[in-house]
């Protein structure tokens, strides 16, 4: 039982000096109800911010309460934002665009492969988000 969230992407929350940030941001936060469930529904949260700002490590996105009350596993995703996540230069392989969406896709694949070890059901996964996160959900469908 640890209570640790991982840092978001630099530049995403520069206005909030108390937010832990790092370029090494491709982490998931996972909250599991106690006792550990068997075959629980999984809810994956994608934060918003216009694809320019945001991080899943803000206290407002803590999934601990939702996991405990609803007996679900909550996963929040960090992804690259701003130019390093969404800059597109047509014809340039160095900046193909939408890397932030690929980060999210990697997180979804990780959940499919690994969530059973946490007591989750990979066949019962719900994506949800707000603002650009909700837009991301639509793009992954």
Curated annotation (Swiss-Prot):
It catalyses: an acylcholine + H2O = a carboxylate + choline + H(+). It is found in: Secreted. It comes from the Eukaryota. Substrate binds at residues 49-50. It holds the Pfam family COesterase. Gene3D superfamilies: alpha/beta hydrolase (3.40.50.1820). GO terms for cellular component: extracellular region. The active site is at 131 (acyl-ester intermediate). GO terms for molecular function: acetylcholinesterase activity; cholinesterase activity. Belongs to the type-B carboxylesterase/lipase family. Esterase with broad substrate specificity. Contributes to the inactivation of the neurotransmitter acetylcholine. Can degrade neurotoxic organophosphate esters. This is Cholinesterase. It comes from Canis lupus familiaris. The gene is BCHE.
């Amino acid at each position: 039982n640890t209570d640790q969230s991982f840092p978001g992407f630099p530049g995403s929350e520069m206005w909030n000096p108390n937010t832990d940030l790092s370029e090494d941001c491709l982490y998931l936060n996972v909250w599991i109800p106690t006792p550990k469930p068997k075959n629980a529904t999984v809810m994956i949260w994608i934060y918003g911010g216009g694809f320019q700002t945001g991080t899943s490590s803000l206290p407002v996105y803590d999934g601990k309460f939702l996991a405990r009350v609803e007996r679900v596993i909550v996963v929040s995703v960090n992804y690259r934002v701003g130019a390093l996540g969404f800059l597109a230069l047509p014809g340039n392989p160095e900046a193909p665009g939408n890397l932030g969406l690929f980060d999210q896709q990697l997180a979804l694949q990780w959940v499919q492969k690994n969530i059973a070890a946490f007591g989750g059901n990979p066949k019962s996964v719900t994506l949800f988000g707000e603002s650009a996160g909700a837009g991301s959900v639509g793009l992954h469908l």
